[in-house]
């Protein structure tokens, strides 16, 4: 064993702010924060649904609060942003070929968004 101290380069907590790629990455990962709140709100909604009509009405009034509506809008925008980043990565991760020719990346991404729109429409019709 050696008593020599290895060189450890000091890294500031804000190192990622200097690199556009890492800023984008941190922004994408931060989209989970409003989604956590949205999930907590829905969990409490399920609990109030079980407790009865009065608790359910209280939860509906809570969800009508402008701050909660704003959090839900931010969560929706965050999830759409997150989906866009994943959809744009898919053609690079899993290139699709038809008859030996690569399918255009834009077509793959647009097909994914079309699937999201179609499924959302079906859910809205059923509900």
Swiss-Prot record:
Keyword match Transmembrane: yes
Membrane topology: Multi-pass membrane protein
Bilayer-spanning residue ranges: 30-50, 67-87, 107-127
Compartment(s): Cell inner membrane
InterPro entries in the record: Fumarate_red_C, SQR/QFR_C/D
Keywords in alphabetical order: Cell inner membrane, Cell membrane, Membrane, Transmembrane, Transmembrane helix
GO cellular component, one term: plasma membrane
Family membership: Belongs to the FrdC family.
Function, as annotated: Anchors the catalytic components of the fumarate reductase complex to the cell membrane, binds quinones.
Quaternary structure and interacting proteins, as annotated: Part of an enzyme complex containing four subunits: a flavoprotein (FrdA), an iron-sulfur protein (FrdB), and two hydrophobic anchor proteins (FrdC and FrdD).
Listed name of the protein: Fumarate reductase subunit C
Organism of origin: Vibrio campbellii (strain ATCC BAA-1116)
Gene this chain is encoded by: frdC
């Amino acid at each position: 064993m050696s008593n020599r101290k290895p060189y450890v380069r000091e890294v500031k907590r804000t190192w990622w702010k200097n690199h556009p790629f890492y800023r984008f990455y941190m922004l994408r990962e931060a989209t989970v924060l409003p989604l956590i709140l949205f999930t907590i709100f829905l969990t409490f909604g399920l609990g109030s649904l079980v407790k009865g009509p009065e608790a359910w009405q209280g939860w509906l009034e809570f969800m009508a609060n402008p701050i909660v509506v704003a959090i839900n809008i931010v969560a929706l925008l965050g999830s759409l942003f997150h989906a866009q980043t994943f959809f744009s990565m898919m053609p690079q991760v899993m290139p699709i070929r038809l008859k030996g020719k690569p399918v255009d990346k834009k077509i793959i991404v647009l097909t994914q968004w079309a699937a999201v729109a179609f499924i959302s429409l079906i859910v809205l019709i059923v509900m």
